[in-house]
Amino acid sequence: NAAILYIWVTPEESRRKNADRADPNGPGSNLHHGVPLAVMLGEYGCDDMEYLVNTSGQKGTVTVKAHGNTYHVPIGIFDNRVDKTSFLRAEPSAWDAALVEDVTCAIRQATDTMWAGYRK
């Protein structure tokens, strides 16, 4: 069993976030890691998830053909093309309640969609 929670960010926004979050003094940190630009361009330079969703054999899924079988993996999409998450790197005491509500609702919508497809 599987499901996909996809965080939708444009490649340009992904590179911007990568540069903003990278801390050269803590490169092993989960919250402040950075990926070299060559890797960002070579491995994350395009986004094919929209194509995979739009060409899937079943709505709300990504079709995967493997080992002689066809799987329809449910997907929930958290649209973060307009940044909803960067504020979360600050101390929680500094978080704006309206921003917390916005990101919470957006993630809940994506996970509810994903879970509904998973339970079918």
Report the location of each language-model feature.
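Conserved GTP-binding G-domain of TRAFAC-class P-loop NTPases and closely related GTPase folds
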Residues: 4-120
